[in-house]
């Protein structure tokens, strides 16, 4: 979903750039090579665009260099047993999977570790009104709502697909230290790397996360706000096999439980930074109890118990026993995987534009969103697909792949689509973070209406996938 | 032919399910499941009854239950859930009766203690903890307990504040309760009943008791969270201080003083 490494990755990069810019004007030029396309970032979006470019006959001969700050060694050899699941998991929509299949990536993804789901329940933690989605009713038999996939599994599949591709260089453990344009380079980007080399390129693609150095170098502003909320993720063990996704909207933020194979579940609990810190400090037993409380008890109850961890094991079982078995609530959680609890701040951010002359931004570099709709990674996949097609079309015509004219269709395709989604998610977050009884009443009425009017539900489902 | 039809068969369908009687299962033995309309009719009926005869404790209790749901009783339970003692009360669900409280033991407690003040107040007013009605119309069993606890604690509020059960005292306490618990019945009583007051009563109420009640009700900690059974030995003045309540002027004394002035 989000990559926490981007934050630490960033600041030194920006700092060094300025130093480099000021010292190199008089220094002799370092060794410069050319690569038609440079992709910065080895996350799902960056790897997908590389895989897509290597898939199309029009672009397969373009030289591509992928630069990643971290090490990809662990990702290449990744393959844990079925008793461990990663805590960074994304819900891939059918259209994301369709494209990954088309470019030959999906067959390299370990399908035993992917969990499809066909039911989804979301409900209001204050009023209890709910909406249920069920693909077998809505979109015909055989359709899934989405596929729960570990981000590592997807990246591992992408790297397998990219192995031994011609004209592709993957430089990991390498930092982008600066981007410069000079008259000698015909104003095309010169990417200065931490290994001392410089690459000139026709198209620089920034897939380098929420604090994208490429975006900063390109002078593209990204606007938005901090939700003052942290997303706590964890891998949990469920009492029995599940094929449903669950999300409960609490005033502090939504808590979602998504199914993984082998009775595992992926938990995303958005809450106040303070509460997230407290939840991470609980013992595994307390944490498991707390998660079960979060799906069953009143918001006040949950907040009290988090504040009084000593009472969790004594008071919470009684509180839970007072709730008669509610079919809308997921099955109990029985354990939390060791060291799987992590949290990160949630932000809404959208770049002013995705393209500039010889530059394109994709994925988190272009937009970040609240995880409540599970769309962050899918938006990046959509970007990669759209940008790859734009480049393919230009390459097929023999046009300049870096010109804004080439990149314009990508921007036109994705910008407003993403903007709409960011807006909807942002409003949903705000709508559900209040306890004002009038707002709660109205939103519950609205949710009940959505739940009972089939065409509205159909429309929402088609929008989500 | 008419004679052969037993009365019960004519009444039976009404008992099973009507516009007013909900057909959902009972959540606790004394529960009377109502529809929304049923609750509204009950509220209006008991409201009128209470307005014209405020001595009808049963009607006051019914009005309280009919107007507390939805929302208000849940808010009150939330106040209990926020407090360790309130949570313990919800878990243990103690009931107050003349037996569980052992009134004779309370009579022997030291002067000024909560228990002694409470029993003196009971004796002075000639009431008993057993005169409190059973909650029937609240749907959630836990909320029903909250209502029951509120009702049973009511006499302790009298003891805590020293307000008598004449109309003005009762009303001042209602206002205090409204500010403190948010239950609408208390608010209705506070606003509507003064319409029946004589001018002198009204002046006393608006000048002294209502401001006292609202100020202290809003300011003090939620009194629903007091575990009365455990603070019986405690000094009333000390408990008032803990909760942040000032004692109001003695209403009966004030009445006498005003009568003398004339």
Swiss-Prot record, chain B:
Q: Where in the cell is it found?
A: Mitochondrion inner membrane
GO CC annotation, single: mitochondrion
Instruction: Provide the primary localization.
Output: mitochondrion
Pathway(s) this gene product operates in, as recorded in its UniProt entry:
Cofactor biosynthesis; ubiquinone biosynthesis
Query: What does the record give as EC number?
Result: 4.1.1.130
- Swiss-Prot/TrEMBL GO biological process terms: ubiquinone biosynthetic process
**KW Phosphoprotein (keyword) present:** no
Q: Which cofactor does it need?
A: Zn(2+)
What spans are recorded as compositionally biased (Basic and acidic residues)? 252-262
Respond yes or no to whether keyword Zinc is given for this record: yes
Q: Which InterPro entries match?
A: Coq4 (IPR007715), Coq4_euk (IPR027540)
Regarding the membrane, this protein is recorded as:
Peripheral membrane protein
Tell me which residues bind Zn(2+). 154-155, 158, 170
Q: Where is this region: Disordered?
A: 243-262
Which reactions appear under catalytic activity for this entry? a 4-hydroxy-3-methoxy-5-(all-trans-polyprenyl)benzoate + H(+) = a 2-methoxy-6-(all-trans-polyprenyl)phenol + CO2
What's in the keyword line of the UniProt record? Answer: Lyase, Membrane, Metal-binding, Mitochondrion, Mitochondrion inner membrane, Ubiquinone biosynthesis, Zinc
Family of the protein in this entry: Belongs to the COQ4 family.
Instruction: Report further notes.
Output: This protein may be expected to contain an N-terminal transit peptide but none has been predicted.
This molecule's function is given as:
Lyase that catalyzes the C1-decarboxylation of 4-hydroxy-3-methoxy-5-(all-trans-polyprenyl)benzoic acid into 2-methoxy-6-(all-trans-polyprenyl)phenol during ubiquinone biosynthesis.
Assembly: Component of a multi-subunit COQ enzyme complex, composed of at least COQ3, COQ4, COQ5, COQ6, COQ7 and COQ9.
HAMAP family, per the entry: Coq4 (MF_03111)
The UniProt entry, under PANTHER family, shows: UBIQUINONE BIOSYNTHESIS PROTEIN (PTHR12922), UBIQUINONE BIOSYNTHESIS PROTEIN COQ4 HOMOLOG, MITOCHONDRIAL (PTHR12922:SF7)
Q: What is this protein called?
A: Ubiquinone biosynthesis protein COQ4, mitochondrial
Origin species: Yarrowia lipolytica (strain CLIB 122 / E 150)
Q: Which gene encodes it?
A: COQ4
